Amino acid sequence: MRNWRLNFVLVIIILFGAAIICRLVYLQIIQAGYYGAMAKGQQKLFQPLQGLRGNIFFKDNRILAADINEKYLFVCPDDVEDKKYTAEKLSEITGLEEKLIAKKLEKESMFERLKDDLTEEESQSLEDLNLPGVYVKDGVSRKYLQGSVASQVVGFLGGESAGQYGIEGFYDDILRGKITFFERGDNSAEKESKGGDIYLTLDYNIQFVAEKLLEKAGSELGVESGQIIVMDPNSGKIAVLANFPNFEPNNYAKVKDFQVFQNGAVQKLFEPGSIMKPLTIASAINEGKISPNTSYVDAGKLKIGGYTIYNYDNRIWGKKTMTEVLEKSINTGAVFAESQLGSELFMEYLNNFGFFSPTGIGLQGEIYSENKELKKGYEINYATASFGQGIAITPIQMIRAFSIFANGGKMANPYIVEKIVGGPVSNVSRSDAGGESERIQGVGPEISAKEIISPKTASQVAAMLVSVVEDGYAKAARIPGYYLAGKTGTAQIPWSAIGVNKEGYSDETWQSFIGFGPAFNPKFIIFIKLDNPETKTAEYSAVPIFRELAKYIIDYWQIPPDYE
């Protein structure tokens, strides 16, 4: 009886063992391919890749910003055995201050990054040194290959790999590479995870020249800051968006005044002064209230309520036409045109010119003013706004509004991104998008469908602006063989704009010039704004800069002359 039970147990054990062996054979031999592939797939899920950030290009495909492969140095302080010796040696090789390195080595940390973008010599020396806790690794860093050129436009990559300011900030989600999970050896993974590439409308050569002209104004005219914008008035394409002073985005951490990061063309308000006069007069002409030949008698000053408005230098001009008002930049003449138009229509035109709304150019931090003081309905506010005081706008708003004279009465919306390739939005441009809801803000051309002034009015005012260059205060803008149209502007800067808690205006000035050419077949429109130059008026500061830049563009683009 006992033997039977023992045999039964042995049989059960043998059968159980045989079942296990059969199962192992099935899994390891018959189903080996299936489970191998399954394991391989599971491994693939746990191999992440941070995609490279997209590149930023100039119009000519010149790289403005890109992720560059590099070697970098880091230390693990807990693993460093002789901290004094290590600090000395690392300082000798890298050129970093020994005190800075020693401070990093004293931290209770597993990772302290010391230096990026190591040279081959530095990298090899560090590896040969082979110090405990000192490591050289491969990495990627964001580089701005054109240095400070267009720095406020491009912005920079800040902490936590987040885009700051400009294109880097506004299009951060598009530029940022995505994290993907890939199978080792899959070469397509890196391409698929890369962020979108952004192609700008900026022309590197003209941008470079414009920035040099601003630097020259800084050194020779004492200009504190300034901007130059060049735009195609037919499309709104921005060829130049230059700022002074600029900064080196590769070393942005060294900048002490954070205001330098701001793009003054879209982030700083100013009062335009006399460059507003053509818009005021155009509004009245468009409504049939006046014509270019309408005359009035200037007495040198004008009383409105308890206020008195004077001409520049208290000049008395006598009888003048509206064309002469622009030539001589007569304040009371602009007030006369506004009075003929009426305050309600005047405000309607200011709104149509886009002075109470942003342009949507697609740069981080664009601002605008609602001009609440102007909207209070006081007659004196309308009067001063007619010649550009008491109304606050940005340079980009100004060039957008002025484009109506060079574009048959229609307003060109400025844009600076031509197209986006790859990334979360593939191959996007405004020109091939099906509608407003499908496009990305600021990408590609878009002409306002709304006619702001009639083509006839636009042509009339353009001719008046040619007279300003030929016979007025902008003679220094003339270029032989070409008809150019433009207007000077000099406006007092409010105390509040220079950080003084005080009402009224200082003796400091904004000096500007806006012009286009050739006047009757425009290819470019240029806006120049200078903050507090040492010259008395824009005639001696902004106008010569316009001429030099316009001459460069005419030669560079090979624009044929109007006459021999």
Residue positions per predicted region:
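Short, gly/Ser/Thr-rich active-site loops of penicillin-recognizing serine hydrolases
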Residues: 442, 544-564
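Beta-lactam-recognizing serine transpeptidase/beta-lactamase-like catalytic domain environment
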Residues: 65, 228, 232-274, 279-425, ...
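Second-shell loop/turn segments in exported
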Residues: 43-45, 71-79, 87-90, 108-116, ...
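Hydrophobic alpha-helical transmembrane signal-anchor segments
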Residues: 1-34
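Short pre-catalytic segments that frame enzyme active sites
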Residues: 30-48, 62, 66-85, 104, ...
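Small/polar-residue-rich segments within soluble enzyme cores
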Residues: 85-92, 104-195, 504, 528
